[in-house]
């Protein structure tokens, strides 16, 4: 009998299929991991304006999903996505403690793509206080990194490294900060810091950028690598290759948005 390593994603459902739980499960499947979702909310989009509407699920229903996945099946790694409330963050933190969960990946999801505003301040503060000290790695973009590190902004490689040091000093075991297209040069730069050394991962920026779901895909790929027994650095490097291929071969799903291609790493990796 062939057994697969298992991973849990605690995230919202993106009805367009590009981000959230849908991106996570696709990524896990592509990397040979049995993925399980615990849905926190359902996100819908207006068909012509693409305006988002978020419908949270009751806290007790989220908890029942966690019990099913963790007690009923078992997990080798887990990640978070959109949590959306301080109460939900508290539930996740308590769950990590209750089951002594390992290989915990926190994707903070504090801002929407292209936005510099923290969406739910009380949830963001709870992530900072409760989940950051409990995680094996956290995967903020530069806006989220500035918030987590108590810095006014993070816009340069030097500031990314400073933020990374502060985030690890605040309790995270490691961090990878996604510079991506927010930095001003022509490279998409992510920087991994494990508390001892920095690893810069730079690839040319990809235009046009069909990047809906890129952050979710990246953190899910890290989670998958950890579930499969890779070291943290190995998991991060594999995830960078996976998401780069997904972006390079991204595609438009309508005339408003384009998504990462989750099959690209398998089909087109060179």
Features from the language model and the residues they span:
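Glycine-rich beta-alpha junction loops
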Residues: 14, 42-43, 84, 110-112, ...
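Conserved N-terminal subdomain of the carbohydrate kinase-like
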Residues: 2-9, 25-113, 117-118
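Phosphate-handling active-site elements
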Residues: 31-36, 198-199, 225-238
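Conserved phosphate/ATP/ADP-binding segment of small-molecule kinases
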Residues: 121-198
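Short pre-catalytic strand/loop immediately N-terminal to key active-site residues, enriched for Gly-Thr
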Residues: 10-16, 198-212
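Charged C-terminal helix
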Residues: 233-270
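Short, small-residue alpha-helix embedded
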Residues: 146-147, 208-232
């Amino acid at each position: 009998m062939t057994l697969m390593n298992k991973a849990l994603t605690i995230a919202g459902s993106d009805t367009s299929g590009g981000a959230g739980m849908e991106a996570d499960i696709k990524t896990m499947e592509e990397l040979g991991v049995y993925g399980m979702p615990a849905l926190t909310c359902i996100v819908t989009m207006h068909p012509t304006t693409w305006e988002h509407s978020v419908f949270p699920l009751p806290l007790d229903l989220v908890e029942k999903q966690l019990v099913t996945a963790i007690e009923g099946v078992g997990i080798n790694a887990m990640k978070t996505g959109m949590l959306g409330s301080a109460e939900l963050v508290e539930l996740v933190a308590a769950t990590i403690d209750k089951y002594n969960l390992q290989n915990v990946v926190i994707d903070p999801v504090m801002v929407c793509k292209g936005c510099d505003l923290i969406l739910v301040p009380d949830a963001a503060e709870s992530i900072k206080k409760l989940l950051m000290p409990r995680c094996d790695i956290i995967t903020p973009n530069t806006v989220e990194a500035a918030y987590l590190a108590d810095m006014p902004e993070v816009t340069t490689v030097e500031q990314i490294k400073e933020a990374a040091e502060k985030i690890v000093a605040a309790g995270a075991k490691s961090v990878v900060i996604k510079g991506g297209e927010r930095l001003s040069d022509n490279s998409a730069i992510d920087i991994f810091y494990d508390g001892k050394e920095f690893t810069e991962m730079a690839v040319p920026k990809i235009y046009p950028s069909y990047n809906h779901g890129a952050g979710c895909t990246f953190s899910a790929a890290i989670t998958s690598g950890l579930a499969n027994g890779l070291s943290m650095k190995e998991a991060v490097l594999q995830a960078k290759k996976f998401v780069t291929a997904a972006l390079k071969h991204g595609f438009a799903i309508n005339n408003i948005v384009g998504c990462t291609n989750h099959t690209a790493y398998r089909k087109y990796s060179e």
